[in-house]
Amino acid sequence: MYPLLENINSPADLRLLPRTQLPQLAGELREFLVESVSKTGGHFASNLGSIELTIALHYVFDTPHDRLVWDVGHQTYPHKILTGRRERMHTMRQHNGLAGFPKREESEYDTFGVGHSSTSIGAALGMAVAAKTLGVDRKSVAIIGDGAMTAGQAFEALNNAGAMDTDLLVILNDNDMSISPNVGALNNYLAKLMSGRFYAAMREGSSKVLGIAPPLKEIASKVEEHVKGFFTPGTLFEEFGFNYIGPIDGHDVDVLVDTLKNIRSLKGPQFLHIVTKKGQGYKLAENDPVKYHGVTKFDPANGLASGKGGAGKPQYTQVFGDWLCDMAKLDKRLVGITPAMREGSGMVRFEKEHPDRYYDVAIAEQHAVTFAGGMACDGLKPVVAIYSTFLQRGYDQLIHDVALQNLPVMFALDRAGLVGADGPTHAGAFDLSYLRCIPNMTVMAPSDENECRQLLYTAFQLDTPTAVRYPRGTGPGAEIQQQMAALPIGKGVVRRRGKQVAILAFGSMVHPALAAAEALDATVADMRFVKPLDAELIRKLAQTHELIVTVEENVVMGGAGSGCGEALQAMGLAVPTLHLGLPDDYVEHGDPALLLSLCGLDAAGIEKSIRERLAG
């Protein structure tokens, strides 16, 4: 079925093929990718768009000696297939299977681990400098696209690289399509300058003015050429010190091979601009690349199923999105901000209903936080919808620009806790630890869908920095009350009364704790707030129980349990404690329920840990 692909187990095998067979290989690779991802799910449209580029890179460069650094990793399935992992593609994003992103431990061809965007240029530059310093003759290549060029980190690296005499190649895979449509001045610059009215007017204007004097036609031609050069995409990158080449067709493997061979012999920083189509070769993905960016299992003949197949429980992301729209109707000061995650953060409806109050700042988490701070200074009430793992990228701004000034910015932290198939790069394992130590912050963790809605409302009422963290996927199925009411700040609630053991559960761990408590006859408190903690409730439970257990879907170190321990110590209560949470390690990808079980954070694991502690 795949006569060429089946004989390629490494790039060395690929380089044995005559160039005339590379287009056939691209076709086979595309067919294999459709078949494979349709069975496992995963990133799809970006991978279809990077096939010819991947073939050309491994054909021209001596990988793994030469370094390929992929940005984000959404487009690296073809790379994995060509580097000896074809037979394991059926394990993609499953526990103990292939990771969905490049991972150094997985293959020597994965030169740099990624998952977050805009890191490739800086990493590849570091490798280029290392090669030069150590006297190693090798090339370093950064492949960046999927909206990652909108992030400031990419331009920091470009600025540094252009001033250094290193053999670095940056390839911009320009498919004009990130997860959400690219926004901002840079995308406008790349996408519109060549066809824009301003460029056309400049060209026409210079011709008209200089056309008055016929002998100056030659000068006019040169001026027009100069105007064209000044306003083409390459100008920006040449100003950074790169030799700009392109744009070229990213789906013409012959052109790619010829161009890369020429560039390989050049010295200094090079910038190759290629144009590709996201979803190339699979019409449904070409027509709707957002829908097919990341997919579940599907029938290749019919594509992804339409609709959701019935009512079912809403995901927490939807609970947030509905609350945001409802709250916007009640308070005209509300504005919504997302760093290029409109769909993932549940803001599609909000953008449609309130386009003048919706701000997608592109992949710019640092800017998103400071931007929100500026809005809050002058009377708006910004809500920053962001994944827990991505807020890490704006941590200094969170402290310096928001919390230090005690500004009313609300952070809606999606994907808090483990995220399953996306693995450790996307897990929200640290937010309780890095938020609770910041003065002026109020941190909340709802236990179900209705509590999520009410705590979102509660957070919005405060005129100080707040964060509400909630997990990926669906909750336990609590009935959502449309009427919103602010919950008492820093107060938890006892959900079950038992004896001997009191479990202080936070957020997503409340319901597993309740299930464990049935077997233990333990007390369970839904703490709701990580900061401020309900010190009075902790005191009462400590005075009436023999063991205090804290449970959270966050690392134990510095998390909510640590806060409870600090509170007990401050009150002088020497009650035995047990802190349960994520380990001091990175939890790998896999089914979320399986991962929680392996971490001892399902009902059975919680019960087991408590019984072992009681047994001494």
Curated annotation (Swiss-Prot):
Residue positions binding Mg(2+): 146, 175
Keyword vocabulary terms for this entry: Isoprene biosynthesis, Magnesium, Metal-binding, Thiamine biosynthesis, Thiamine pyrophosphate, Transferase
EC identifiers of the protein: 2.2.1.7
Cysteine disulfide partners in this protein: none
Classification via CDD domains: TPP_DXS (cd02007), TPP_PYR_DXS_TK_like (cd07033)
Molecular function GO terms recorded: 1-deoxy-D-xylulose-5-phosphate synthase activity; magnesium ion binding; thiamine pyrophosphate binding
The protein's required cofactors: Mg(2+); thiamine diphosphate
A Pfam family this chain is assigned to: DXP_synthase_N
Cofactor note text: Binds 1 Mg(2+) ion per subunit. Binds 1 thiamine pyrophosphate per subunit.
Source species, domain of life: Bacteria
Annotated Gene Ontology cellular component terms: cytosol
Coiled coil, from the record: none
Pathway: Metabolic intermediate biosynthesis; 1-deoxy-D-xylulose 5-phosphate biosynthesis; 1-deoxy-D-xylulose 5-phosphate from D-glyceraldehyde 3-phosphate and pyruvate: step 1/1
Binding residue positions for thiamine diphosphate: 74, 115-117, 147-148, 175, 282, 365
Matching InterPro entries: Dxylulose-5-P_synthase (IPR005477), THDP-binding (IPR029061), Transketo_C/PFOR_II (IPR009014), Transketolase-like_Pyr-bd (IPR005475), Transketolase_BS (IPR020826), Transketolase_C (IPR033248), Transketolase_CS (IPR049557)
Group of enzyme by EC: transferase
Annotated SUPFAM superfamilies: Thiamin diphosphate-binding fold (THDP-binding), TK C-terminal domain-like
Record's catalysed reaction(s): D-glyceraldehyde 3-phosphate + pyruvate + H(+) = 1-deoxy-D-xylulose 5-phosphate + CO2
Quaternary structure note: Homodimer.
Functional note: Catalyzes the acyloin condensation reaction between C atoms 2 and 3 of pyruvate and glyceraldehyde 3-phosphate to yield 1-deoxy-D-xylulose-5-phosphate (DXP).
Similarity-based family: Belongs to the transketolase family. DXPS subfamily.
Name under which the protein is recorded: 1-deoxy-D-xylulose-5-phosphate synthase
Organism of provenance: Chromobacterium violaceum (strain ATCC 12472 / DSM 30191 / JCM 1249 / CCUG 213 / NBRC 12614 / NCIMB 9131 / NCTC 9757 / MK)
